[in-house]
């Protein structure tokens, strides 16, 4: 504590102007003084602003239509899934907003969401975009890395640590965040699977996830890893954390077919054709997930199920060009920085999309296909001032030939290389 000399008189608070006799304490700085009353006032102002910033995303909750409009800017197709997500997320945060003194006996329970669809159909992107729309912390976890307590692998609490880190260790903010757990179908119990790791990363992990899905105060190791008896823990309440679970659930169509079997038998082949993969997924029920290997208690914690469609060539072409951050726009911008124009022909876009379908990677594989066709160009162009335009053709994608290169006069530079 700063001690005043006896010969110093008329010391005043530099903020409110009160003499030292009018306040309990006067703290000195470099040529300035502040009294205890002003310190308390400043503390209150800072606390109010912090509280306001923490709840800002929640108080400005967009409507389901506004949420879907924002999703449409970044995610192409999947209209049903986007609508289901928009309504579910809106209801979740509306529920948080109205928490407080109970005016009646109606308790609004949390509704976590399951996204079922093939690899590359947009499950992760949907979850990421939702978090950005709502300005809440977001974390991604892979269910295959989780194991039952006592085995090598991640505890389920490590999922919460990622969310806390995304919130810059602001626990209040983290408690209103979103966690996306991918490949949730990989922790389904399957009697025909003889893998030992399936036993410790299957039903045991489902049991461990139950509490945090429903809502509990979890103890999280600040450095991650396994818990130790004398380790200081971070306490976090998961009641208001929204969990979105994603998985491809390969083969679940057969489970649905068995359930619908008596309805399909006796139909003509044309009628049976209606039960294609997409139509079957649209009829998924909780009992199908249970038959697939998820335990009933786990299914009960995830009441909302949205299925994503397999992306066809048209959808993938739209994904390449239409979103705000579309890949074609990204690579075009990248080459613009080297004063080079980049162009994709319609046939090239179709070829990229067809190759992604052939590889069964969906939208997730589009970037790697473009990267493969452009890697040499992005290496050479910065040191070749003659090139002002690059054109990606179907031949570039299908035959892995060099893209067409043009100079400032529009002359094709590498004609001999592309004519093969």
UniProtKB/Swiss-Prot annotation:
PROSITE patterns: CLPX_ZB. The gene is clpX. The keyword Zinc applies. ATP-dependent specificity component of the Clp protease. It directs the protease to specific substrates. Can perform chaperone functions in the absence of ClpP. The keyword Isomerase does not apply. SMART domains: AAA, ClpB_D2-small, zf-C4_ClpX. Belongs to the ClpX chaperone family. It comes from Staphylococcus aureus (strain MRSA252). This is ATP-dependent Clp protease ATP-binding subunit ClpX. GO terms for cellular component: HslUV protease complex. Component of the ClpX-ClpP complex. Forms a hexameric ring that, in the presence of ATP, binds to fourteen ClpP subunits assembled into a disk-like structure with a central cavity, resembling the structure of eukaryotic proteasomes. GO terms for molecular function: ATP binding; ATP hydrolysis activity; ATP-dependent protein folding chaperone; protein dimerization activity; unfolded protein binding; zinc ion binding. It comes from the Bacteria.
